[in-house]
């Protein structure tokens, strides 16, 4: 791998500054409008054209086919649903129509409920992003009657139904690790950073991925513009149970998910680039399949291969839209302590800038 990316290039500090800045702007699932407008301004200030649709911000440089990237920008949070009543935003009944029960997040959200206790939260106005108050989660539990997580929050009893509540967050750095609610603001930061450094392709910033809806926004854009591609590259984080598991690779690829196989020249290109540049990678579907063999031998239920935004797009388009995923391995999934290695982030930046920017990032 390029030594300059292992040994922290000068331009990595601006990336961290950008990530810190984006993390501070809330973007709860179903209430992403103010964050999308924030991204729109950041892009237009550097001369990138944008179009804002319902649930989708499309950015295009001077060479729109030189890379087609996508990243969801919603983050897990809470919605006020009544007098002193708060529910997990992504799994509200009105948001569940596209959830099939086969995503990794749906299988794990019950297990992580207690991680949110004592978490500071902030309420905001969903259109302007204006601050509406600070609170603290006192309890979180599964309510079987409504099939959702219920939160007891101190300090926000004045809120009206429909008000989004984000987990109060800031980027933390310790040694070679960074932590925050990284899923998936870190991918948005990567794309903005690439544009700042010469990327001229197309990027999609999608809403409501955590509610299983983001694929619709991208798919509809391709359909109404009568465009097909086999080079859509979706950026995201990929959860692992332990740091040891996560550190076995710098980047995570996929051959398939539960919905579809990924048949794209980009997948082969990514694998070849990683081999050539000594970047350790793994394929998440292979990792899960190997884990399931052990689970079956021990009489444990098998894990889902996971449902991705790209898999739904490939399936619904009958393969007319194809691509692959490029993910950062993390631990602490769906919390404000989600952790990634700096080497992983640098590897992703190195890969994307080498593939899509004619003149690589300044050293």
Sequence positions of predicted segments:
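N-terminal hydrophobic/helix-forming segments and targeting peptides
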Residues: 1-363
């Amino acid at each position: 791998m390029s030594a300059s990316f292992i040994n922290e290039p000068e331009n990595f500090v601006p990336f961290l500054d950008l990530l810190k800045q984006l993390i501070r702007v809330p973007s709860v699932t179903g209430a992403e409008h103010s964050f999308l407008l924030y991204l729109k301004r950041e892009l237009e200030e550097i001369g990138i054209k944008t179009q804002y649709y319902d649930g989708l911000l499309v950015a295009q440089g001077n060479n729109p086919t030189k890379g087609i990237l996508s990243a969801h920008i919603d983050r897990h949070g809470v919605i006020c649903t009544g007098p002193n009543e708060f529910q997990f935003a992504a799994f509200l009944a009105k948001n569940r129509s596209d959830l099939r029960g086969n995503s990794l997040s749906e299988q794990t959200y019950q297990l992580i409920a207690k991680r949110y206790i004592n978490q500071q939260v902030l309420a905001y106005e969903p259109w302007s992003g204006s601050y509406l108050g600070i609170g603290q989660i006192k309890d979180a539990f599964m309510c079987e009657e409504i099939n959702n997580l219920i939160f007891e929050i101190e300090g926000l009893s004045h809120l009206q139904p429909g008000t989004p509540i984000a987990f109060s967050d800031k980027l933390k750095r310790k040694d070679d690790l960074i932590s925050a609610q990284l899923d998936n603001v870190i991918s948005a930061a990567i794309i903005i950073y690439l544009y700042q450094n010469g990327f001229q392709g197309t990027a999609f910033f999608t809403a409501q991925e955590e509610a299983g809806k983001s694929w619709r926004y991208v798919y509809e854009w391709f359909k109404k513009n009568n465009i097909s591609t086999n080079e859509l590259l979706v950026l995201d984080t990929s959860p692992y149970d332990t740091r040891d598991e996560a550190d076995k690779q710098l980047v995570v690829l996929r051959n398939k998910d539960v919905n579809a196989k990924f048949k794209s020249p980009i997948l082969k290109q990514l694998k070849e680039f990683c081999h050539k540049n000594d970047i350790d990678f793994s394929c998440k579907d292979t990792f899960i399949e190997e884990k399931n063999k052990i689970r079956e031998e021990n009489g444990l239920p098998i894990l889902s291969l996971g449902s991705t935004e790209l898999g739904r797009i490939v399936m619904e388009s009958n393969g007319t839209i194809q691509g692959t995923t490029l993910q950062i391995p993390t631990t602490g999934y769906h919390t404000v302590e989600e952790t990634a290695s700096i080497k992983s982030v640098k590897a992703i930046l190195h890969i994307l800038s080498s593939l899509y920017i004619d003149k690589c990032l300044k050293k």
